[in-house]
C-alpha cells in the first residue's frame, strides 16, 4: 500500500538525526510514497530538502521554537485536516509535541523516533510523548530501546529498534580516496587518522585531540583530519592551535564527499562517550 507520510523535525542543526530524516524521505519517495516534511525554517534540513524534485514531495518549513506555539499547532492541524495522511512521524521534542497532539486530535497514527541514547525525563507530562501519544516508538538502537522502555507507562511491545541504514550505492568498497589524500598532501604510505561527525560535547573531539601527541610519539609522520561542523568547531580549532599541532591536523568543516573521505583514511575514530544511537559514520 502506498502511504502519505508526514515527517516532522524541529532540530535546527545538521547531524545524523537530520541526515536520517532526509534519507528516509528520499527512499520513501523512491518507493512511490507521498512524503510531506515539516522542518525548522532556515535550517540545513530545509536547504537540502529543497533539492528534492518530486511531485509527491511537499516541503513545509515552519519556525518551531516552542511546543506551546498556537500558530504552529494550528498550521499543522490545518495541513493534516486538508490532506489524507496515513502516518505522522515525529523526531525531536518540540515537533513531537506539536505533531503528536495534532495526530491524536485528527485520528492520524503517530510514530515517534528517539535517535539519541540520552536519558528520557519521564515526569508528567513528558512521558506522554512515549506512552499516550504514539502508536509506535522507533529507536536507533537496542540501547535506546531499553532507555525508552523504562519510561513510565510505556508499552514495551510498542518499542521497535531500527538502526540507521547505509546506502550502498554511495558507500562502496571500490570508492577511491586518492583525491582526498592528494588534497591533504598525504604521501604514499603516510598514516591518516580521521574523525567524522558533528562537533559537539559528547562526540569526544577533546579525547581525539589528546590522543594525537601520543600517536605522534610512535608514528611521527602520522596526519589527522577532523570532518564536520557544529557548535564546538571554533573551540576545537582553537585547541588545535594551542596544542601546536596545526601542521598535523586538518579541520575540513562540513563535507558532502564523506564516502571518498572514509576511503582515504587508514583509521576512523569514534570517540563518542554519550548520546549515540547508531553512529552512521560507522
Where are each of the predicted segments found?
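Membrane-interface segments of envelope glycosyltransferases acting on lipid-linked substrates or membrane lipids
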Residues: 1-282
Amino acid at each position: 500500500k502506498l502511504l502519505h507520510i508526514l515527517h516532522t523535525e524541529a532540530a535546527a542543526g545538521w547531524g545524523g538525526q537530520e541526515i536520517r530524516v532526509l534519507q528516509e524521505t528520499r527512499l520513501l519517495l523512491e518507493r512511490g510514497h507521498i512524503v510531506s516534511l515539516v522542518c525548522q525554517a532556515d535550517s540545513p534540513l530545509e536547504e537540502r530538502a529543497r533539492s528534492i524534485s518530486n511531485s509527491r514531495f511537499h516541503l513545509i518549513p515552519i519556525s518551531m521554537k516552542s511546543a506551546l506555539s498556537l500558530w504552529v499547532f494550528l498550521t499543522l492541524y490545518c495541513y493534516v485536516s486538508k490532506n489524507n495522511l496515513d502516518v505522522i512521524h515525529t523526531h525531536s521534542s518540540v515537533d513531537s509535541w506539536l505533531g503528536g497532539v495534532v495526530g491524536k486530535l485528527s485520528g492520524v497514527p503517530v510514530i515517534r523516533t528517539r535517535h539519541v541514547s540520552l536519558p528520557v525525563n519521564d515526569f508528567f507530562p513528558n512521558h506522554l510523548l512515549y506512552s499516550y501519544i504514539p502508536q509506535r516508538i522507533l529507536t536507533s538502537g537496542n540501547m535506546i530501546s531499553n532507555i525508552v522502555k523504562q519510561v513510565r507507562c510505556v508499552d514495551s511491545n510498542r518499542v521497535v529498534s531500527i538502526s540507521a541504514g547505509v546506502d550502498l550505492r554511495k558507500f562502496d568498497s571500490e570508492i577511491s580516496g586518492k583525491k582526498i589524500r592528494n588534497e591533504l598532501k598525504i604521501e604514499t604510505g603516510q598514516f591518516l587518522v580521521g574523525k567524522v561527525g558533528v562537533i559537539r560535547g559528547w562526540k569526544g573531539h577533546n579525547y581525539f585531540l589528546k590522543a594525537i601527541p601520543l600517536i605522534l610519539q610512535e608514528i611521527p609522520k602520522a596526519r589527522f583530519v577532523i570532518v564536520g561542523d557544529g557548535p564546538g568547531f571554533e573551540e576545537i580549532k582553537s585547541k588545535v592551535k594551542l596544542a601546536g599541532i596545526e601542521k598535523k591536523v586538518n579541520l575540513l568543516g562540513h563535507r558532502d564527499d564523506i564516502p571518498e573521505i572514509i576511503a582515504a583514511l587508514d583509521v576512523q575514530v569514534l570517540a563518542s562517550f554519550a548520546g549515540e544511537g547508531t553512529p552512521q559514520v560507522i
